[in-house]
Amino acid sequence: MSNTENKQKRVSVGKDIATRRRVARARRHFRIRKTLRGTPEAPRLVVHRSSRHMHVQIIDDLAGHTLAAASSIEPEVRAVEGDKKAKGAKVGQLIAERAKAAGIEQVVFDRAGYKYHGRVAALADAAREGGLKF
C-alpha cells in the first residue's frame, strides 16, 4: 500500500460530523475553563445550549453553589413569540433579574465552548442590558 492510499484511508475512516463537533466543543470548553473561575464577587455565568433549549446558571466555583438559574423551558420563556434567538434573549433578561435579586452585579461569562454567535450572543447581550457586567 502506498503512502497516498494510506492517507486516503485515514481520511475516510473516522467519526461522523456530529461527534467531531461535540468533541471540538468539549476541547474548547476545557481550554476556557482552565482560565475561568467564578468567585463570590464575580461568579461564573455558564450557558448550555441544546438544539431546542438554553439553560444558564450563575455559579460560585469556590463554594460549589448555583446562585441563580434560568432556562427556556420555563413558562415565561415558552410564551415568547419568535425564533430561538428571541427565547435566548428572554433567558438572558431572566438571569439578569434573578442575579440582581441575589445581589450579583459582576459575572464572568463562560460560553462553554459554544461560539459567541446567535442564541449565545443574544443571551449575553440581554443579560448586559439587564444590568449584569461581564
Curated annotation (Swiss-Prot):
Gene3D superfamilies reported for this sequence: 3.30.420.100
Keyword Ribosomal protein: yes
Keywords: Ribonucleoprotein, Ribosomal protein, RNA-binding, rRNA-binding
Signal peptide: none
GO biological process annotation, one example: translation
One GO MF term: structural constituent of ribosome
GO cellular component annotations of the record: cytosolic large ribosomal subunit
Entry's family note: Belongs to the universal ribosomal protein uL18 family.
PANTHER family in alphabetical order: 39S RIBOSOMAL PROTEIN L18, MITOCHONDRIAL, LARGE RIBOSOMAL SUBUNIT PROTEIN UL18M
Role of this protein: This is one of the proteins that bind and probably mediate the attachment of the 5S RNA into the large ribosomal subunit, where it forms part of the central protuberance.
Assembly with partners or alone: Part of the 50S ribosomal subunit; part of the 5S rRNA/L5/L18/L25 subcomplex. Contacts the 5S and 23S rRNAs.
Name the record gives this protein: Large ribosomal subunit protein uL18
Organism: Corynebacterium efficiens (strain DSM 44549 / YS-314 / AJ 12310 / JCM 11189 / NBRC 100395)
